[in-house]
């Protein structure tokens, strides 16, 4: 097949499915070139405004000209300039200067490329967190409602993926929520820990600005403070090389990778529960699970989350390696890698949160299936209760234990060797030895008596930890997610 012209046919060029297929428009824009280069121009404006306020010869007319052209970006011209200059920042300096001829002389005054590059990255990372946090809060809120609704519904617990003591559907969901609440706290901390790079010059010494202000250190410090405030940050990093420390990127991607681990665990549980036919993710009326097997109801949303969460978890390796090989004040081998991993981490996190919200808004529970599985396993779990009841009725503990051992082994053989149902209780009812407690067997086998404090734990956890954590996001809780499958 001949290679078609990509300019004539956009489908002839590879597009990342993170953007073309999955991510929200808001997160896609956050990492777009329009957002990036528009932010560069705003940073040049902030710098000029601050320099003017501190006495440099910059006119109101120059400032107004810059303000009027913040989004008037000739991307074609910028691309041509970059092709010629082999320098993206200078290409955009020239492009901005072209539409601001009066301000051309003072654009980028005293700055280095990382003034716009790194500071823009920090703004984009901050804004990315601000997009993710409400989404994560909505997922937690939906799951909290689900947990509250099913706080008392007994279900078979599993350890080692083998039947264990009973829990409740709501309590199991709270395990998911607890992990996500930790992620919420970690994302908030990572966002709030972000500082502005500020105006630091080529190697972080602020030498160019000290020269501009004729050795006035206080004005250089004030310039840094003013620009930092204009960009919406409370603090800037006190010391930098040419770039801000790449350990910051490690922190950012670490919390996102941790979120990926949480989502992967939750969606794996949902996939296993779907196999057990106890809980299913939403399944549309006309949705097709398999082209060959019409009966299939595949948990494809949860599978998508797991697939993308694995990608998200691996991305943290990039900033770890990048930070470790930055020589002295900086090397450029960070640049291409960061263009990929930072954007992909936030886009991927955005996708899995949107998908998980959609799942959590439509989880379907099948209580009768859950109850049937409990009834298959509960008789064996109830043996201790039966022994205690017999002793209270005057029986001998050792004799009772032996009787139950024999009957339970017989029942287990029916289940494992014959494929039948667990008939242990029927055997107990048929044995005259247990006649003193026959009328109490139903109460001894009530599943709710085996769930301990699970319902109370759910109520306390939701009230004291979950709901308070969601208070800052109350105004952003509306809206359901409709996925493009």
UniProtKB/Swiss-Prot annotation:
User: Could you give one GO CC term from the UniProt record?
Assistant: cytosol
* Reaction it catalyzes: N(6)-(1,2-dicarboxyethyl)-AMP = fumarate + AMP; (2S)-2-[5-amino-1-(5-phospho-beta-D-ribosyl)imidazole-4-carboxamido]succinate = 5-amino-1-(5-phospho-beta-D-ribosyl)imidazole-4-carboxamide + fumarate
Pathway given in the UniProt record: Purine metabolism; AMP biosynthesis via de novo pathway; AMP from IMP: step 2/2; Purine metabolism; IMP biosynthesis via de novo pathway; 5-amino-1-(5-phospho-D-ribosyl)imidazole-4-carboxamide from 5-amino-1-(5-phospho-D-ribosyl)imidazole-4-carboxylate: step 2/2
Pfam families, per the entry: ADSL_C (PF10397), Lyase_1 (PF00206)
Where, if anywhere, are coiled coils annotated?
none
Q: Which CDD domains match?
A: Adenylsuccinate_lyase_2 (cd03302)
* Tissue specificity note: Expressed in liver.
Q: Which residues bind substrate?
A: 21-22, 86-88, 112-113, 242, 304, 330, 335, 339
One annotated GO biological process: 'de novo' AMP biosynthetic process
Keywords attached to this entry:
Lyase, Purine biosynthesis
Gene3D superfamilies (alphabetical): 1.10.275.60, Fumarase/aspartase (C-terminal domain) (1.10.40.30), Fumarase/aspartase (Central domain) (1.20.200.10)
Where are the catalytic residues? 160, 290
Q: Which SMART domains match?
A: ADSL_C
Expression induction? Significantly increased expression by estrogen. Rapidly up-regulated within 0.5 hour after extrogen exposure with a peak at 1-4 hours and diminishing thereafter.
- The superkingdom listed in its UniProt entry is Eukaryota
Quaternary form? Homotetramer. Residues from neighboring subunits contribute catalytic and substrate-binding residues to each active site.
Q: What family classification does the UniProt entry report for this protein?
A: Belongs to the lyase 1 family. Adenylosuccinate lyase subfamily.
What role does it play?
A: Catalyzes two non-sequential steps in de novo AMP synthesis: converts (S)-2-(5-amino-1-(5-phospho-D-ribosyl)imidazole-4-carboxamido)succinate (SAICAR) to fumarate plus 5-amino-1-(5-phospho-D-ribosyl)imidazole-4-carboxamide, and thereby also contributes to de novo IMP synthesis, and converts succinyladenosine monophosphate (SAMP) to AMP and fumarate.
Could you tell me what this protein is called?
A: Adenylosuccinate lyase
Specify the species. Gallus gallus (Chicken)
This chain is encoded by the gene named ADSL
């Amino acid at each position: 097949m001949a290679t078609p012209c990509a300019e004539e046919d956009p489908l002839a060029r590879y597009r990342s499915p993170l953007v073309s297929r999955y991510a929200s428009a808001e997160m896609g824009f956050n990492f777009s070139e329009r957002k990036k280069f528009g932010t560069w121009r705003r940073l040049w404006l902030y710098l000029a405004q601050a320099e003017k306020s501190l006495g440099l010869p910059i006119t109101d007319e120059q400032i107004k000209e810059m303000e009027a052209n913040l989004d008037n970006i000739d991307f074609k011209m910028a691309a041509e300039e970059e092709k010629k200059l082999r320098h993206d920042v200078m290409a955009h300096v020239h492009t901005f200067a072209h539409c601001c001829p009066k301000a051309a002389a003072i654009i980028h005054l005293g700055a280095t490329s990382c003034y716009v590059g790194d500071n823009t990255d920090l703004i984009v990372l901050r804004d990315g967190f601000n997009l993710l946090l409400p989404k994560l809060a909505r997922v937690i809120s939906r799951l909290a409602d689900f947990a509250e609704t099913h706080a008392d519904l007994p279900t078979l617990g599993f350890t080692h993926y083998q039947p264990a003591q009973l829990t409740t559907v709501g309590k199991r969901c709270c395990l998911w929520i607890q992990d996500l609440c930790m992620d919420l706290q970690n994302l908030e901390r990572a966002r709030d820990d972000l500082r502005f790079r500020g105006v630091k010059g080529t190697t972080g010494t602020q030498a160019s600005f000290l020269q501009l202000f004729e050795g006035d250190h206080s004005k250089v410090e004030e310039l840094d403070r003013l620009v930092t405030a204009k960009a919406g940050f409370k603090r800037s990093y006190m010391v930098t090389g040419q770039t801000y420390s790449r350990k910051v990127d490690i922190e950012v991607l670490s919390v996102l990778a941790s979120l990926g681990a949480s989502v992967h665990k939750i969606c794996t549980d949902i996939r296993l529960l779907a196999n057990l036919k106890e809980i299913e993710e939403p399944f549309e009326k006309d949705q097709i699970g398999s082209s060959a097997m019409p009966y299939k109801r595949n948990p494809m949303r949860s599978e998508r989350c797991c697939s993308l969460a694995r990608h998200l978890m691996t991305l943290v390796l990039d900033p770890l390696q990048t930070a470790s090989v930055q020589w002295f004040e900086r090397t450029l081998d960070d640049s291409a890698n960061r263009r990929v991993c930072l954007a992909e981490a936030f886009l991927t996190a955005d996708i899995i949160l949107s998908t998980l919200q959609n799942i959590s808004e439509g989880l379907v529970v099948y209580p009768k299936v859950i109850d049937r599985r409990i009834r298959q396993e509960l008789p064996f779990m109830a043996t201790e209760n039966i022994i205690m009841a017999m002793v209270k009725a005057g029986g001998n503990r050792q004799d009772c234990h032996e009787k139950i051992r024999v009957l339970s082994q017989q029942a287990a053989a029916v289940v494992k060797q014959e494929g039948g149902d667990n008939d242990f209780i029927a055997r107990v009812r048929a044995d005259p030895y247990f006649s003193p407690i026959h009328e109490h067997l139903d109460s001894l086998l009530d599943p709710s008596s085996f769930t301990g404090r699970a319902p109370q734990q759910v109520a306390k956890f939701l009230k004291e930890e979950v709901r308070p954590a969601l208070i800052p996001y109350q105004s952003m809780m509306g809206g359901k997610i409709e996925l493009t499958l």
